[in-house]
Amino acid sequence: MSFILRLKLSAMMFLQFMLVASFWVQLSTYLNNMKIEGIMFSLVMSTMAIGSIFSPLVGMFADRVANSEKVLFVLNLLVAIFLTGAFFSTDPTLIFVCLLLAMCAYMPTWGLTSSIAITNSTAEAFPTIRVFGSLGWVSAAIFSIVASQYFNKTIDGTAIPLACGAAIAFISAVFALTLPATPPQSKGQKMSLSDALGLGAFSMLKDRNVCVFMACVVLWTVAFTIYWMYGSFLQDLGVKNITPVLNVGQISELLFMVLIPVSIKFIGFKKTMAFGIFAMLVRYLFSAFAQDVPNLYWGAIVVHGIIFGFFFVVAQMYIGKKAPKEIQAQAQGLYFFFYGIAQIVATFFSTFLIENIKKTPEVAKSLGCVVADTAASLAKTDWTSVFYNEAGITAFLLFFILVFFKDDVKD
């Protein structure tokens, strides 16, 4: 693989993840400030999950009909248009519709960019390319930092990050046209109805270990999804500049991403993913005690690199190893399909926990909050109990993968 090709694939990942990080990390805070609550809050936060469900269909299109880089161009252009619409919208329903359309176009790009990178490089080189996605995520904090340092303004919790996302989406669309031609692997082959619907990769579920793997993906997503609402947790703790704070997790992701090939080589896929799950258990235990020992939330954020890299990214590598070459894009789409279904359930579940497990103001004050004035806010949610629930799910997942999943592919 040439240096120029590696550079292009790395830049693709950088832009694609900078795009979503620029607005999604602080979206829950923005919705809170807009007084969007209850079912509408859950619907908006589930748009990422709903978008993931379309991944197999887009994967089919890339596998059989059109070049992957051209599909990526169209999708990113649509994202730019719909995020612009969300930026100018003040009505909750319009915000939901615009974000739903934006995420339906955006989420399939996770599997698509992975497929482009793996097709044009190697599975072994993928982590060193994918790490630039983490770097892009971290770099999204530049908008908050510039606004704060040079304009003395706070953009977290406003609509401005949506405009930032739209701008990056447009740049990503243009850049997609410079990527190496990635023609459909199965073009010209006979296509069945299931292929037309992007369901070809579902045949992989005949493999018992793939079924167990997908069950792990579902459970992991159910436990992980509350992290997308971590901004609300930090806001209740009185933390300022939420996006840069959360980006500490992405910095750790950069460090651990480069260790993925080493981990897989020495301990295999199963133990690597199990270690990522264990790190998530540590996150929720730290988070549960953060109201008593505030600085623990830093530990909960720092382990994000292990959680995301050692499970989410390694899981993509595993399904890539298991999938036949002719359905690589659909296989990545299958992964994100299950991820999306689970995230929809998890979003409503997490919202239910946050809105229904409450603590009285008196108990909140007795905790000795980071900022005394936030005691009333902490009364809204008993975050300790919320994170105990998440820790319980994670502990079960750790047991499940260690007992039922088999390490059936070689590095």
Residue positions per predicted region:
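Structural signature of the two symmetry-related core transmembrane helices
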Residues: 70-84, 271-286
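Hydrophobic core of transmembrane alpha-helices in multi-pass small-molecule transporters
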Residues: 14, 82, 92-109, 218, ...
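A membrane-interface helix-boundary motif in multi-pass transporters
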Residues: 148-167, 352-394
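Cytoplasmic helix-loop-helix junction between adjacent transmembrane helices
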Residues: 100-132
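Juxtamembrane intracellular "pre-TM" segments in multi-pass secondary transporters
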Residues: 1-3, 179-215
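Helix-loop boundary and gating motifs at the non-cytosolic
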Residues: 2-52, 209-245
